[in-house]
Amino acid sequence: SIIVVCLNPGTKLNQTLDSILAQTCPDFEVIVKDGGSRDGSIESMRTDGRIHLYQEPDHSIYEAMNQAVSHVTGDYILFLNCGDLFYDKEVLAHTAQFMEQHPMKLQGIYYGDTYSAKTDTKISSPPRITGFVCYRTIPCHQSCFYAADLCRQKPYEPKYKIRADYEHFLWCYYRAKAPMQYLGLTVSSYEGGGYSETKENLKRSAAEHKEITAKYMKPVELFRYRAVMALTLAPLRTAMAESRHFSAIYQGLTSKVYGRRQEK
């Protein structure tokens, strides 16, 4: 089940739907959850038997996502925002094949890499999820296939305006003990530059990160992770990762590091 939530998305809704409908694997459904668009985007929305539209008022993107989850019938859920795309037309086919070859005994998450349209680079995800990965940088939400039951058991918390998906991921790792498997492929093309990346919301994001990590991680664990971040010049690395000029170099080095770890 692919969930797309929207409110006055303009032409971006159909861009995302076209990317989904182009998939060579036909076994999917699309849940479009609209919060009351008035820009004509719903009237001009693509029509397909696999697209299901639900219109209901909501107070935030995370409340809209929770509403959408109640309508899914698939075993796994992927969230795509309007403007985000599948990286190529084979993503679902390759993911389905991987899931068949690597089944999970428990409800878990399959995740992959992400192409950043903003910096024109591929963002590599770690081949193994650890506590430090949870503290530092989890895989992009648009590149994670969640077992639907994980989203039903633990709805997104609307009190977090920026990081409710991050809080949910940490719940999956620390509380649900959900298995997580790396797909080894690029799942989504992430548009970036949206609501969460404004100057004001970056400050809110940092505050929410502090609250959420304290909720799931022990003080000793937090101290260790913060020390590592300080010693490895985290602000400089972040600036490089977000720079269109240096992002490719940084992500290339990251990919090589992850590759060596995977080989071990």
Please name every model-derived segment.
Residues 1, 29, 167:
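Cell-envelope/extracellular polymer assembly enzymes that use nucleotide-activated donors
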Residues 18-27:
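Short, acidic, metal-binding catalytic loop of nucleotide-sugar glycosyltransferases
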Residues 26, 34-42, 81:
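A conserved acidic beta->alpha catalytic loop
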Residues 77:
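Short aromatic/hydrophobic "clamp" motif used to bind/position activated sugar donors
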Residues 55-72:
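Glycine-rich, basic loop-to-helix element that forms the pyrophosphate-binding segment
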Residues 11-14, 39-47:
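Acidic helix N-cap motif at the loop->helix transition within catalytic regions
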Residues 85, 89-122:
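Conserved donor NDP-sugar-binding/catalytic core segment of glycosyltransferases
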